[in-house]
Regions:
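Mature extracellular/luminal domains of secreted and GPI-anchored eukaryotic proteins, especially small
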Residues: 1-174
Length: 174
């Protein structure tokens, strides 16, 4: 299922995005591909690690999905923020997302699962975040001084992270 989703996302990026946003989305998709291959290859160490943590993560999936919905909603809203704040809001929201995800599993599943979730997110998005978000690290003044987005009553325009991420990167390019 994850591989089919990745294939669809790559087709969307190739067909619908200009060069710069396509490159940024592909960077994220490359990270996702690496992590998916590691956990789905039965002979890889990543597979055993995934199996070790997956049951508890599945039991607390509602919290994890809420973290993703919150991230998607913030990215959707960030597109409408002033241009100079968009990148920072997006980057800092990834920091909040990572904290949400690890927090969702730390107590019920243990610190090992929280570390695994942190590692997964870094594997998925680390190259993109290191490239684009270099000036917006967790807890820095750069994140603390950004405008606060108004609390939205919408459930979000997007069901997936790809579309708002592509809109953010496209809006930065022109």
């Amino acid at each position: 299922k994850e591989k089919a989703s990745e294939k669809c996302a790559r087709a969307y990026a190739n067909k619908c995005l200009a060069r710069f946003p396509r490159g940024m989305v592909m960077l994220l998709l490359d990270g996702i591909r690496t992590e998916v291959n590691a956990k789905c290859n039965g002979s890889a160490a990543g597979h055993q690690e995934y199996l070790k943590h997956s049951s508890c993560m599945n039991n607390h999936g509602a919290k994890l999905h809420q973290c993703m919905r919150d991230l998607t909603q913030v990215l959707d809203q960030s597109v409408d923020a002033p241009t100079k704040s968009r990148l920072g809001l997006s980057c800092c929201s990834f920091n909040t997302y990572k904290t949400c995800m690890t927090g969702a599993v730390r107590e019920p599943c243990g610190s090992g699962t929280a570390a695994y979730v942190d590692k997964l997110i870094t594997g998925y998005a680390g190259d993109l975040l290191d490239t684009v978000c270099i000036n917006f690290k967790a807890g820095t003044d750069a994140c603390k001084t950004l405008p606060v987005l108004p609390k939205s009553t919408k459930t979000g325009r997007s069901a997936s992270l790809l579309s708002p991420l592509a809109r953010i990167v496209t809006s930065l390019n022109g």
